[in-house]
Amino acid sequence: MNYRHAFHAGNFADVFKHAVLVRILLHLREKPAPFRVIDTHAGAGLYDLTGPEASRTGEWRHGIERVRAAPLAPEAASLLAPYLEAIAAFSPGERLVRYPGSPLLALRFMRAQDRLTACELEPSASAALERALAGDPRATAVAIDGWVALNAYLPPKERRGLVLIDPPFEQPDEFSRLAHTIVKAWRKWATGVYMLWYPIKDRRAVGAFAGALAASGTPKILRAELAVGAGAGELEAAGLVLINPPWRLAEELKILLDPLARVLVRGPGGGYRLNWLRGEA
């Protein structure tokens, strides 16, 4: 595997993904029963924004740094505040020097009774993840292929929870594999929330992926996409598919995505899309 997230930590795609992740976690913790978070491609856990990788690309300056500095309308600012406060907690002082990956961000919003299973196969990232999670009894780092993990850890003993699937998309068949795997996973644990991240580079592949999910029989599928426009670099747009989203999440994203896109857009073609593939139209 050649993908290294340290080059991209805190970029627009991370901001988009993690802002939505935090909203989901806040909904899950509204009920007292414990929940499980399964992160199939968890990465290293914590990223140094002053290190050579992040400094080389500077992507975080056009992502999290822009959003932190931007004035937002009160309603959108309120929805984004828990995410921004969590990010700030990893960098003492005013300057942003570290950016948490999904596992550490999730733990900020999990309670004593909740559990995290964070999976990462790549050896150096897996070792870093284990160090990042060490000492937290709620978290388990597992050196396992994320696709294998879905079969191994579903269903968990908890009835409620979130499965985050964020693969590196290095293989040509990643979209078809993702569609097949997520439907199989949902059938094993139909009460869980599923959050799937994907890059938008090949519109035909993305369309086929959305069509396969829409025809899958899963009852509620919400799609959100955010594009920062031409000239933004190798990745100009990303999407999220949300299966069984919390019932108020769609309304929150209607409020949040437009101002977020306006802050993050860097060129022509920027904007967002939010629609139901199945269910609540």
Model regions: which residues?
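Class I S-adenosyl-L-methionine-dependent methyltransferase catalytic core
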Residues: 1-281
